[in-house]
Amino acid sequence: RYGKNGGSGITAGKVVQSKARVGADHTNCTATAAVAAGETAISIETNGTDITADQYAEGYLWVNDVNGEGQCLRIKTHNAHDHSDDASISFTCYDDLATALTTSSQLSLMENPYSAVIVAPTTHTGPAVGVTTIDMTASYYGWFQTGGPAAVLTDGTITLTGPVVRSNGTAGAVEVLDSDDDAESQVLGQTMAVNATTEYSLIWLNIGP
């Protein structure tokens, strides 16, 4: 997948994740006004935190509760937003709204998962979205591998053909799936060839299409 590196350089063979969401300020936001089915423009009342122009472009606006819940729309464009001046902000989406919204509808925001990736930290702050295949300069665009054979930093002892998850001990690495500790973690792939800890093993990635 094509995306943008975040504010720090990343070397090859590292697991990367999407940057952490803004959180509560852009979650459970109510619709500013009722929105009819078929519309692509949706205005919401944010709970805080300013938004730069097109910060959420190619990201997602979804209805998480009440009328219209279950819909997820990809954002095309929006203006800058100063929350202290006006809590409302309008988003233009690519797809039409299928079910109408009311002012009780609750909506949430997510930036494009590939808009500013970071090395996957040992404490999860977002989903893993790929692996770097070359050294990448900070804030540059490039490709992140999501499937097939990839050399990936290894933490601990992994097993041939066994599933691997992101490491909780070394940022950007994979480790063997521990069913006691990692049963609900995101499985990133299966081991094709085992190399020693701190080296790079060959992993068949299953992160995404």
Set out the residue ranges of the language-model regions:
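Extracellular receptor-binding modules and their adjoining Ser/Thr/Gly/Asp/Asn-rich linkers
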Residues: 1-53, 65-209
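Short conserved beta-strand and strand-loop elements enriched in small hydrophobics
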Residues: 58-65
